[in-house]
Structure formats: C-alpha cells, structure tokens
C-alpha cells in the first residue's frame, strides 16, 4: 500500500484532496518566492513561513510525521530569518534544497509510493539561522 492509499484509508477523501490541492499551490510558487528573497526579503520570508506553517499543520493532521517534522525545521529556520535584513547565499541554497525535498515528497504521494528519507544535506542548517 502506497502513501496515497494510506491517506485515503485513514482520512475523508475531501480532506486528502484539499491537502493535495494545497500542495499544488506550494509546488507552483515556492521557487519563485525563494528567488524573490533577494529583492523583497521581508515579504518573501513571511510568505515562505506561511507556506511551511500550512504544510506543517496539514501534515500533522494527516499524521505524515516525516514531512511534519521537516516543515517544522524549515519553519524554525524561517523564524530566525525574520530577524535578519537579507538572505545569505547559504540560506537561499538551503531553501532550494528544501523546495526540492518538498517536490520529491509531493511526487511520491501523487504516484502512491512510500515517502523517501530526507536529503541529508538539509540536516546542515545555514549558518546564523
């Protein structure tokens, strides 16, 4: 049984479909928001924080612990980023890695696979965040 089958088995189908639709929005926008960090830092950090906060809440409800813990980690980094005036290259690179991880899990859910492990490079947090 893949992860999508498990989600439908354990939750109302409307909730699962809403979760996938919400994730579609994240996938469509996240890289553009990361790119905007260089030109509109404060608004972009706030938007990224909202994205990962929403993902954290949804995955907690659906009991997707791996994604939930990861979303909390990114949210913590972004909370620290809110205290800064600009993004470092290291932060931007790390956020693109985080985006890639989210996209990989999105693909695995949509193809009803098991969730892969987190990319180990993401465990090295950007300095100062």
Where are these regions (language model features)?
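Non-catalytic helical tethers at domain boundaries
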Residues: 1-129
């Amino acid at each position: 049984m893949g992860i999508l089958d498990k989600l439908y088995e354990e939750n109302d189908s409307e909730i699962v479909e809403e979760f996938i639709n919400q994730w579609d929005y994240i996938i469509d926008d996240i890289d553009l928001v990361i790119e905007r960090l260089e030109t509109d830092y404060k608004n972009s950090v706030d938007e990224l924080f909202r994205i990962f906060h929403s993902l954290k809440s949804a995955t907690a409800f659906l009991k997707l612990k791996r994604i939930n813990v990861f979303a909390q980690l990114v949210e913590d980094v972004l909370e620290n980023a809110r205290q800064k005036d600009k993004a470092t290259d290291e932060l931007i690179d790390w956020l693109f890695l985080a985006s890639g991880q989210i996209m990989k899990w999105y693909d695995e859910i949509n193809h009803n696979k098991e969730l892969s492990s987190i990319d180990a490079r993401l465990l090295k947090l950007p300095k100062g965040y």
